[in-house]
């Protein structure tokens, strides 16, 4: 299918301007296809490294090297984050940003096998597909650069290397630093078990580590001298669980105990819990948070301990932009879904057997989901970007249908050719979307008008993590 055919899907409906002859004949998708080997190579390398948030040194270095080889100008170490960067190519015209996440998750790893197969000595894995995210976004940015260059279209394409999405809120610090203020539109994508460009928002969230200190003592010889920090954690957890009953239906809260002592016969003088609170809007998070802090204070008072807490991260919900989402949906439909080879289908069938009732027909990978508005129950720091500039995203079937994020099945597919195929599809959709935005001023204006109306005339950006500095050691 020629670029002109793909473009016609949206050109009539969305404030189209006549295209220059060269933009009609140069197909941006071909620029993605020309990079297929590089896309898979980078995705696999990042999958092998599986670097954690704010520690993505090799991953970010590789991405910057690839951009530099394509004559992008690189600014590294931005927003006081050593692994964050912006690569830019072009001049004048609109500024279109493409976001690239790269961090892995701790505590889960897996080979690319279709059965459970942890890798000995490896303590992290790409269970959210950010190796694919990075590779696909890098490919799209380079494809857009080549298209701009060949067509002589004015404008700048930027790739934002955004670390620590998984609980580190890297994009929040980048937003707070004003790095998106001159961007016309930001484009992102994510690994998934389906293909969709629906206008899907997310939950606002905040996390913190609650640290209790007490007095150590012999648990049998002198228990009366001890003040158990673990008692403080447990008392707080009990009150938090009671709080669940009085939270709104669409809110949620979860926690883990990260430190609880080392020996049963020693009263622990230190204990720590790690909490997340989520709600569809930031004010809802704040209301629950006040009560959670009260639970922490009450637990300390009742157990004779002390407590302090550190906010680790916080994200605003995604501000959807329907004007952009409808166009992205049309681009995705013009491309179609993910087609498996016989070998890939056999591998996917084995994965599907491990999913139980969550399994879905393998043919779903080749389909495009319906367009509409929906609420996703996860959270992402893309939300803060979406309050700085109009933002649009897409999801593609990089995982076997029915696979959930943060599972070993997601790790396996993210290191498999199925994941690479979904990445290619995402790169093509983003490239088509960016090309449309560069030449369609009417679409850019419509997106900005919707964005301004959604934020409101008196909007002032507020970060849910406050004024803290990036927690560069939160994964150490």
Residue ranges and their predicted role:
Residues 132-202:
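Acidic/histidine-rich catalytic neighborhood of metal-dependent amide-processing enzymes
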Residues 22-126, 131, 135-156:
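Acidic/His- and Gly-rich active-site-bordering loop/insert found
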Residues 231-234, 238, 242, 246, ...:
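His/Asp/Glu-rich mid-to-C-terminal helical/loop segments that flank catalytic regions of hydrolases
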Residues 8-18:
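Bacterial N-terminal signal peptides
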Residues 46, 87, 98, 130, ...:
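Divalent metal-coordination and catalytic microenvironments
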Residues 1-9:
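Bacterial N-terminal signal peptides that target proteins for export
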Residues 182-340, 344, 350-352:
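Midchain, well-structured core segments that form catalytic/ion-binding scaffolds
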Residues 345-427, 445-475:
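Zn-dependent metallopeptidase/amidohydrolase metal-coordination segment
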